[in-house]
């Protein structure tokens, strides 16, 4: 009886703390949209421009840097 009560309380507690992921896709799309807007706003280098060490800034617009922006 005590074990049953403990299990019920634990399940209720975990259910109350569970993450609501019903609109997870919507939130993910919103986050990607915000990242794209920030990428457009900041200064970035076009493809073919030297990037990376020893020149860490500015970043490549594509997000890929292999000694030159991809």
UniProtKB/Swiss-Prot annotation:
Designated name of the protein: Conotoxin Qc6.2
Regions crossing the membrane: none
InterPro entries registered for this protein in UniProt: Conotoxin (IPR004214)
Lineage: Eukaryota, Metazoa, Spiralia, Lophotrochozoa, Mollusca
Prodomain residues: 19-40
Family, similarity comment: Belongs to the conotoxin O1 superfamily.
This protein's UniProt keywords: Cleavage on pair of basic residues, Disulfide bond, Knottin, Neurotoxin, Secreted, Signal, Toxin
Subcellular location field: Secreted
Disulfide bond annotation, renumbered to this chain: 44-61, 51-65, 60-69
GO cellular component terms attached to this protein's record: extracellular region
Pfam families found in the cross-reference section: Conotoxin
């Amino acid at each position: 009886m005590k074990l049953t009560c403990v299990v019920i309380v634990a399940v209720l507690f975990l259910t109350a703390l569970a993450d609501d992921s019903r609109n997870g896709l919507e939130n993910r799309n919103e986050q990607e949209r915000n990242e794209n807007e920030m990428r457009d706003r900041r200064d970035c280098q076009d493809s073919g421009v030297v990037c990376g060490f020893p020149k860490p800034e500015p970043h490549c617009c594509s997000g890929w840097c292999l000694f030159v922006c991809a």
